[in-house]
């Protein structure tokens, strides 16, 4: 029986991974490692779940928290394209924090690491080039924001670490998973959009080109892919060692506005008029200036305006081919759970 650690286990995706690990037959203990205290810690009658408050940049505390662990699912990250954190803060957690986790793997002889990367490790790029493809599609990877850059650099670090020698001459095996836009219960950004629509009289004003198609994935299915990858990476001859995979399911691929409308229409939200691009650009520039001068974050800035209006559509079944992944939640269930959470959080 194994001991698993989930860094960022109090977060949006991490919490769902912990929930699913409770049903994993080969897991005896789950260590939930996060810098923040979980206000609603998950409990179980069949698994030992230990919560450890820890900064992943503190090597000594990380080493202590991970001592005795067999496998790490590393989800901890600062996900920010709105200006809440400085560039240095984002790099410190996302890149250097991942360095710390890898160093602990080497020092403690931990043989398996599943890393939560991001679609932004690939794109959309700073040029606004559309992406339609799979893990092996050629694309100009040129990050336009420090968050995307940090996830790209960390992913490369984890991929390079695969098959490296650790304590007692054993090998470290790694795998990277790249969620597309995650949604579901606990999605704070979705909640903000819903609250804005309510404030505008149940109207969703459109800000995104209808042709800017984006792939989405339900949080439960993204979590399941992590749990499944953690199982398969331990098999001799596993295909996933040293590879990266997009997280996907059968959620609709469409623009952000259309996706939100599909999800929220049963909650009484109606489509509104389209805000002119010149006006959005003006507000984005204004918000960028506020961020620079006053450290004031904003959902609308020049970066978010560009990436939301740039197609990023994943068409792949590589996770199914290499580790037998298939979604465990269908779209109807995913949407219903998300709607229920939005209503209950009002």
Swiss-Prot record:
It catalyses: a 3beta-hydroxy-Delta(5)-steroid + NAD(+) = a 3-oxo-Delta(5)-steroid + NADH + H(+); a 3-oxo-Delta(5)-steroid = a 3-oxo-Delta(4)-steroid. The gene is OPG174. Its EC number is 1.1.1.145, 5.3.3.1. The active site is at residue 147. NAD(+) binds at residue 151. This is 3 beta-hydroxysteroid dehydrogenase/Delta 5-->4-isomerase. Pathway: Lipid metabolism; steroid biosynthesis. One of its GO terms (molecular function) is 3-beta-hydroxy-Delta5-steroid dehydrogenase (NAD+) activity. InterPro entries: 3Beta_OHSteriod_DH/Estase, Lipid_A_modif_metabolic_enz, NAD(P)-bd_dom_sf. The keyword Glycoprotein does not apply. Belongs to the 3-beta-HSD family. GO terms for biological process: steroid biosynthetic process. SUPFAM superfamilies: NAD(P)-binding Rossmann-fold domains. Catalyzes the oxidative conversion of Delta(5)-ene-3-beta-hydroxy steroid, and the oxidative conversion of ketosteroids. The 3-beta-HSD enzymatic system plays a crucial role in the biosynthesis of all classes of hormonal steroids. During viral infection, steroid production contributes to virulence by inhibiting the host inflammatory response.
């Amino acid at each position: 029986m194994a001991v698993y650690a989930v860094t960022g286990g109090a977060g949006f995706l991490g919490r769902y991974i912990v929930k699913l690990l409770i049903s994993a037959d080969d897991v005896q203990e789950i260590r939930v490692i996060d810098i923040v205290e979980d206000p609603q810690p998950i409990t179980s009658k069949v698994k030992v779940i230990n919560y450890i408050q820890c900064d992943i940049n503190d090597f000594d505390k990380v080493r202590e928290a991970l001592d005795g662990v067999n496998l790490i699912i590393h989800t901890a990250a600062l996900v920010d394209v709105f200006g809440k954190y400085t560039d240095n803060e984002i790099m410190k957690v996302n890149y250097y924090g991942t360095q710390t986790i890898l160093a602990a793997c080497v020092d403690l002889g931990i043989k398996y690491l599943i890393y939560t990367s991001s679609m932004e490790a690939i794109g959309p790029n700073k040029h606004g080039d559309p992406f339609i493809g799979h893990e092996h599609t050629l694309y100009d990877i040129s990050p336009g924001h420090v968050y995307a850059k940090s996830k790209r650099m960390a992913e490369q670090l984890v991929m390079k670490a695969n098959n490296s020698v650790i304590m007692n001459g054993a090998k470290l095996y790694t795998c990277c998973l790249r969620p597309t836009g995650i949604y579901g219960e606990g999605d704070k950004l979705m909640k903000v959009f819903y609250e804005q629509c309510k404030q505008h009289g149940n109207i969703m004003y459109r800000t995104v080109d209808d042709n800017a198609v984006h792939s989405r994935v339900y949080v439960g299915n993204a979590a399941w892919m992590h749990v499944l990858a953690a199982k398969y990476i331990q098999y001799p001859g596993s295909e996933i060692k040293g590879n990266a995979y997009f997280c996907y399911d059968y959620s609709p691929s469409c623009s952000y506005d259309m996706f939100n409308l599909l999800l929220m229409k049963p909650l009484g939200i109606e489509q509104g008029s389209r805000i002119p691009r010149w006006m959005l650009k003006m507000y984005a520039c204004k918000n960028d200036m506020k961020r620079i001068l006053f450290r004031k974050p904003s959902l609308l800035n020049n970066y978010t305006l560009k990436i939301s209006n740039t197609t990023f559509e994943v068409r792949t079944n590589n996770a199914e081919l290499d580790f037998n992944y298939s979604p465990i939640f269908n779209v109807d269930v995913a949407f219903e759970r998300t709607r229920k959470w939005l209503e209950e959080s009002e």
